[in-house]
């Protein structure tokens, strides 16, 4: 059983020459993306397409961006990632619509065994990460293998997300935990007790 098959079926695998050859082609495309964005956005998106990344419209990664394969990533529409986004996509990473990443957000689908002898044998693994719709992940957050983040979620800056997060909550911390529910009462406010002015509020309610 070859290691590309093992990797793609969520089995323990070793990064042999065949695996590394796939990464090499992606690194070329991502290097070009980081060089041309934001000055030549159409060319930049062509670079992402070369990796095999599946994405809808209005997808943007502020450079520098890093991923290992690209072909394992699916991104919904209206996605924005600030600088230094890292996706270790040794398997599937799925991101919904209307998702925002702060700077230095990392999705670590990859991992290694905890026992030293198993780890030293060079085996690694990848477990899927899923992020729902209407999610904002604050700066310097890490999302670890196997995590599912629900819809309409805010993850506070600096969080390490080790477990699933349900829909409609604010969560933060290391390890990340639910702080409170998000309700309709939050809609008129943009920060703590600061309300939107009339012009901004009217624009929000146009939709």
Regions found by a protein language model. Name each.
Residues 65-75, 80-149, 174-175, 181-191:
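Flexible, glycine/small-residue-enriched loop-and-beta-strand segment within the central core
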